[in-house]
């Protein structure tokens, strides 16, 4: 009978130890997650300047113990410090006309090791594009007026000039779009 008691106690103890689950990652509060995301951006983006957190609003759904996906939303601004200097972000002031980046990130805690994916793009980009388009339209009007002044040129020359202006405008627009694509960074996090 005494042997049965010890065997039962041993089995119950083994089940109790095996039954306790530990998280595959350490609990991560929202502020730590955002700080980690900014640090990852600074180390992996290829930018010359460091970026520092400007604003982050904790979502109501953030669960530091969750094993599911978690979402981040924050903005950061370019600082006067260069990446090559390897200085602490607390020492770096914001650039007066520094770029403000709007970022969305996802932590995938279900992966082993956990993975974070960040997508950042300049804030106010759409407003700048509209302003640039307005400026380009003004330039076109000026160019058309200039063409009218050059009435003594053959019609063929005018058509070629107009065609090449449109081509130049299209190339500039596509080049700007290409270089303003959002930066996407994905890394695994060793916890």
Swiss-Prot record:
Keywords: Antibiotic, Antimicrobial, Cleavage on pair of basic residues, Disulfide bond, Fungicide, Membrane, Secreted, Signal, Target cell membrane, Target membrane. This is Cathelicidin-related antimicrobial peptide Bf-CRAMP. Residues 1-22 form the signal peptide. Potent antimicrobial peptide against most of Gram-negative bacteria, some Gram-positive bacteria (Bacillus) and some fungi (C.albicans, P.pastoris, A.terreus, A.nidulans, and C.globosum). Adopts an amphipathic alpha helical conformation, that may allow to partition into the target membrane. No hemolytic and cytotoxic activities have been observed on mammalian cells. One of its GO terms (cellular component) is other organism cell membrane. Residues 126-154 are annotated as: Disordered. It comes from Bungarus fasciatus (Banded krait). The keyword Secreted applies. Coiled coil: none annotated. It is found in: Secreted; Target cell membrane. Expressed by the venom gland, stomach, trachea, skin, muscle, heart, kidney, lung, brain, intestine, spleen, liver, and ovary. GO terms for biological process: defense response to bacterium; defense response to fungus; innate immune response; killing of cells of another organism. Its main location: secreted. It comes from the Eukaryota. Belongs to the cathelicidin family. Residues 23-161 form a propeptide. It holds the Pfam family Cathelicidins. Residues 134-151 have a biased composition (Acidic residues). Disulfide bonds join 81-92, 103-120.
């Amino acid at each position: 009978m005494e042997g049965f008691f010890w065997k039962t106690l041993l089995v119950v103890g083994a089940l109790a130890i095996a039954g306790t689950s530990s998280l595959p990652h350490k609990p991560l509060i929202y502020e730590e997650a955002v700080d980690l995301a900014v640090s990852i951006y600074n180390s992996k983006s290829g930018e010359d300047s460091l970026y520092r957190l400007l604003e982050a609003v904790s979502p109501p759904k953030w669960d530091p113990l969750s094993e599911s996906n978690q979402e981040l939303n924050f903005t950061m601004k370019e600082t006067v410090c260069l990446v090559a200097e390897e200085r602490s972000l607390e020492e770096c002031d914001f650039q007066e006309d520094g770029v403000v980046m709007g970022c969305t990130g996802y932590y995938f805690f279900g992966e082993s090791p956990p993975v974070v994916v960040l997508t950042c793009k300049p804030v106010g980009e759409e407003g700048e594009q509209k302003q640039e388009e307005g400026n380009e339209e003004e330039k076109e009007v000026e160019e058309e007026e200039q063409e009218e002044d050059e009435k003594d040129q053959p019609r063929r020359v005018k058509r070629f000039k107009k065609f090449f202006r449109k081509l130049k405008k299209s190339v500039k627009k596509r080049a700007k779009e290409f270089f303003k694509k959002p930066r996407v960074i994905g890394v695994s996090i060793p916890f």
